């Protein structure tokens, strides 16, 4: 119920966060008919309840546990929304992204809605865990294509509190597929991390071609040339992500251009 609060505020909550203004939980609470929060911490289970943003049950201990984590259950307020339907495929896609981006993380999603209009006849369930992380993400994107080399190329590095990893594989298509993320948030318009990757890839392949005699100095490949048939995943994590706009479609941190460029230049060469 407090604005500008959460993992990225106050320090020490999370190393990285995808939030911008610290209003997510508060907004969901305000737009819910009811919301319940359970937190497993220090051997106890704490519970607190709300209705349309107001406290209906103060925080109390409801049990003990040897686990830790947070459970949030809520019902959207029909007075605020014309429709309360959730799209399973949208949620499934988002959860699958998270599983790929965080190697070894186990995520399950269950759709228990059955028997009503536009609902399946049985419960839908998916369990996702990818030990290979973004390597497997690239393979998933290429699953209906023919790779030109068996192994997915993987590169990673860090500088201070910033980390970056890149995975790529060429296939027999003519299309370019570059999917980038910052703090596990999809950046469909790219940004500095994509710029660094594209620049390094072009420079490395041109340098290799010239060294091996495939290219002349005045006959270099363009960026479009080297990205034809490429599938690549770029994932960066940083403490102070600067997104352009509330939709977080583009990353603006110039330092990530430098870091990704250096990683690809050093490890792909």
Where in the sequence are the language-model features?
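Flexible helix-coil linker/hinge segments at domain or subdomain boundaries
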Residues: 99, 254-269
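Hydrophobic (often cysteine-bearing) scaffold residues that line and stabilize catalytic clefts
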Residues: 87-91, 193-194, 256, 260
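Mobile ATP-lid/nucleotide-binding loop of the nucleotide-binding subdomain
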Residues: 2
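GHKL/Histidine-kinase-like ATPase module
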Residues: 89, 96-98, 104-246
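Surface-exposed beta-strand-to-loop junctions
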Residues: 73-75, 179, 262
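GHKL-type ATPase core
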Residues: 5-132, 136, 140
